[in-house]
UniProtKB/Swiss-Prot annotation:
This is CRISPR-associated protein Cas1 3. InterPro entries: Cas1, CRISPR-assoc_Cas1, CRISPR-assoc_Cas1_C, CRISPR-assoc_Cas1_N. Gene3D superfamilies: CRISPR-associated endonuclease Cas1, C-terminal domain (1.20.120.920), CRISPR-associated endonuclease Cas1, N-terminal domain (3.100.10.20). One of its GO terms (biological process) is maintenance of CRISPR repeat elements. It comes from Methanobrevibacter ruminantium (strain ATCC 35063 / DSM 1093 / JCM 13430 / OCM 146 / M1). Its cofactor is Mg(2+); Mn(2+). Homodimer, forms a heterotetramer with a Cas2 homodimer. Mn(2+) binds at residues 165, 230, 245. GO terms for molecular function: DNA binding; endonuclease activity; metal ion binding.
């Protein structure tokens, strides 16, 4: 079970073997710790030492996200398992094998980008959007043609891939600009200081996705701070951002674009003083993203939820690192 605690003045307590969620003096919910897989906190509140201990001892992942989509902190139970896996991960992140998995992740992202704008343009049939789509298709071919070996310059190759990915993303967001209603005021992607509801909603929803991806990586014994594509930075969960690339369009972009196109969200839902999203819309976004995460599709011959697919992709990373099995990214043609 995933617990998501949103809003102000909420607190987390321990009562026997239960987690108790309270607001001011009132009890909102109590859940047996054995039923909880992870807890995501979005907002301001407090948690008792006893609750922290109970959460940690039962290996429940705890993550805090601010209203702008930034991960504040995570809590994980200390483990000395999977040392060999971690060593392989660190080694691979610094050689050509890491580039191979990064290439697959980028290619999957671009396939999903192409599929998303193709779906959005199905009825509109805008010619300039078709040009952007063709540009992304060329970028997919460029990425797919890259080959890496033991003598490959890691930094240069990574920069080249990110350059191709960056160009494809420019085309993707230009296409999105053409496809969304003009009155919504979306002109370009802004992940730092969004002043429109579309960008703010994307940032917020990506944070929810980050929580899901981070959970899958940790469960499978991987170090979320050691990535293959994104450069390692202090306090940045690089591998989380790597794997997120495969799921951004299907789990976040399509959800937010649908809310915009059906006028369920507008710029009136954005507080212009600090560019934060209203409480009702935050709850709406959380609900829609989690509904999508828990929805099922047919993937590689199995009927799986997106949450299960994220876990499956994390396991593919493990099998690539330990057994040398080929890694294939997640993408859909629609």
């Amino acid at each position: 079970m995933k617990i998501l605690i949103e809003g102000y003045n909420k607190s987390i307590h321990k009562r026997d073997n239960q987690i108790l969620i309270m607001e001011k003096e009132g009890e909102l919910e109590k859940i047996n710790i054995k039923k909880i897989d992870d807890i995501t906190i979005i907002g301001k509140g407090s948690i008792t030492f006893d609750a922290l201990r109970l959460i940690s001892e039962n290996n429940v992942r705890l993550m805090s996200i601010d209203y702008f989509g930034k991960i504040n902190y995570t809590l994980e139970y200390p483990s000395n398992e999977n040392i060999f896996l971690r060593k392989q991960q660190y080694k691979t992140s610094e050689n050509h094998k890491g580039l191979i998995i990064a290439r697959e992740m980028i290619m999957s992202k671009m396939i999903n980008q192409k599929s998303t704008i193709k779906t959005l343009n199905k009825n509109k049939k805008l010619e300039n959007v078709k040009i952007f789509e063709r540009n992304i298709n060329e970028a997919i071919k460029q990425i797919g043609s890259l080959r890496f070996g033991e003598r490959t310059d890691i930094e240069k190759s990574k920069m080249k891939m990110m350059g191709i990915e960056g160009s494809a993303s420019v085309d993707y967001w230009l296409a999105v600009n053409e496809l969304l209603p003009k009155e919504i005021g979306f002109f370009s992607r802004n992940n730092r200081h969004p002043n429109d509801i579309t960008n703010a909603s994307l940032n917020y929803a990506y944070a929810i996705l980050a929580s899901e991806v981070n959970k899958a990586l940790v469960i499978n014994g991987l170090d979320s701070y050691c990535g293959f594509l994104h450069f390692d930075r202090q306090k940045r969960t690089s591998l989380t951002f790597d794997l997120m690339e495969e799921f951004r369009q299907q789990l976040v972009d399509k959800v937010v674009f649908s809310l915009v196109n059906t006028k369920q969200i507008s710029n009136d839902d954005l507080d212009k003083r600090n560019n934060s999203i209203s409480l009702d819309v935050r709850k709406l976004i959380i609900g829609r993203v989690l509904d999508k995460v828990n929805s099922n599709i047919n993937y590689e011959g199995e009927n799986l939820s997106y949450a299960q697919i994220i876990d499956k992709q994390a396991k593919k990373i493990v099998n690539y690192l330990i057994n040398g099995e080929k890694y294939t990214g997640f993408s859909l043609r629609w």
